[in-house]
Amino acid sequence: MDVLRPQIVTFDGRNYRKNPIQEKQYQHEEDEDFYPDSMEYSDEPCGAYEVAQTPHGFRATVSAPSLLYKHIVGKRGDTKKKIEVETKTSINIPKHGHEGEIVITGQHRNGVVSARTRIDVLLDTFRRRQPFTHFLSFFLNEVEVQERFLMFQEEVLRKCSKDRGVDSTIFQNPKKLHLTIGMLVLLSEQEIQQTCEILQRCKEEFINDISGGRPLEVEMAGIEYMNDDPAMVDVLYAKVHMKDGSNRLQELVDRVLERFQSLGLIVKEWTSVKLHATVMNTLLRKDPNAEGRYNLYTADGKYIFKERESFDGRNILKTFENFYFGSLRLNSIHISQRFTVDSFGNYASCGHVDFS
């Protein structure tokens, strides 16, 4: 790691320097014992914490979903005790299954700040290990598009079914066609509500200006593939663009992405959203409920490898290069929940903002 360019971790809009760590591995250890002696953090945040002075010293609070409490406690309470001893503070964590704030108290302000920083870094570390739970999206499942998609599937199977790896199992469910803006880890109802509020602020600050307070008229037309070799395709997608040829949809989704990245809610992997709708995905071959490259973690956040069999997409790309899937009016950004289905067969929406 370059010490002059350390990893920066963002919490609540503030940036912190994260020093390198050395993890020791022990047989049969669980993740909650993650706090080896060799771990060190820069205890002073780059921004200011809200630390209240009390008659007995100083106090700070940390908001965190109950699912992550165990990582602050550690096995037999070792992690919590270690932080308390080294920072000369007392840390009160809500009981398992109860939502609330983690409260840090101590005689010295620096100690409280140090404990708060260590807890924040631990929370960020283990949040990053959680599987994605939700995603920001546009629904692309209007009736015309579903019908045209089924026509595309029928024609592909009629003309290209003899090509290696091409069969009916790798086509997307037409009711679940969508455009993803970014993936989220939301671990409580409070975090879902906060995400709804952020979307609402986006609407007030720039979505209304970009959309003009009206639905965006778009078309799904043309196909493209994700990887470098058209003879070994894993994901084939339909392209999405504005009917009027403008860049408004791209500008809108990029601004939303930037806002969520700046708040630490979406990992900064890209600076721009690739406008696409997946129509064929080889992960679906063995698991109809698979959700693309994001379906790579178990329920407890452990990485897994999914073997996938690619398909030869050369004939499909040549024959259906400009296939027209239909036009749509995009009027809402949804907070979609993974592995769920609503009454229309789409992903369940936990909240949304409308353009009009």
From Swiss-Prot:
CDD domains: KH-I_ASCC1
Residue ranges of the region described as Required for interaction with ASCC3: 1-52
Subcellular location: Nucleus; Nucleus speckle
GO biological process: DNA alkylation repair; regulation of DNA-templated transcription
Gene Ontology molecular functions: RNA binding
Gene this protein is translated from: Ascc1
UniProt keyword DNA damage present: yes
Tissue-specificity statement: Expressed in the spinal cord, brain, paraspinal ganglia, thyroid, and submandibular glands.
Cellular component, GO annotation: DNA repair complex; nuclear speck; nucleus; transcription regulator complex
UniProt-recorded name of the protein: Activating signal cointegrator 1 complex subunit 1
